[in-house]
Amino acid sequence: DGTDEERLVVHLDKVDCTTLVETVLALSLADKYGKSDFESYKKALLCIRYRNGKQAGYVSRLHYFSDWIKDNEQKGIVHERTGELGLAVSQILNLDFMSTHSDNYHRLKNNPSMISQMIEIERKWKNVPVSYIPKTSLNVSSEELDIKNGDIIAITTNIKGLDVVHT
């Protein structure tokens, strides 16, 4: 949003692929607990969007989707099931795109302290095995893939240091 302060940004009228997933999930969580007010939605969104559900600056946001999935699985919000699917294979993940391309990120640019914090987060994602379904296996039906209503699908990338380019 152009400011240096990290705050929960909510735009229901314009979303990207990840914020769409977060928005729908937050609305679903609020509804699950019988809450339909905007504050309950924002509370659920904050829980989903930030590491351990706590907003503590820019690097507390779950910028990498693999990190987002792991954190939200630990909170009991989602379940990573790719590895359970018969077509899944494993690859080694090494996340470092944000720290190695810090000039592309307003909050990281010219901020060595914040880059160091991001490097610490990325370090936890060095040589981590993750499951994915190769493109060559996607010529089967959604039933064969065992995709269920409400599943979140992420499109992986071969861009060095990055995990996902679309959800």
Each model region followed by its residue ranges:
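Short, well-ordered coil↔helix boundary/capping segments
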Residues: 11, 15, 144, 158-162
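Acidic/His-rich structured neighborhood in mature extracellular/periplasmic domains
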Residues: 3-131, 148, 154
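C-terminal soluble interaction/assembly domains
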Residues: 140, 148-167
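Short alpha-helix capping/helix-loop boundary micro-motifs
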Residues: 131-143
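Short amphipathic alpha-helical segments, especially helix-boundary/capping motifs
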Residues: 2, 142-145
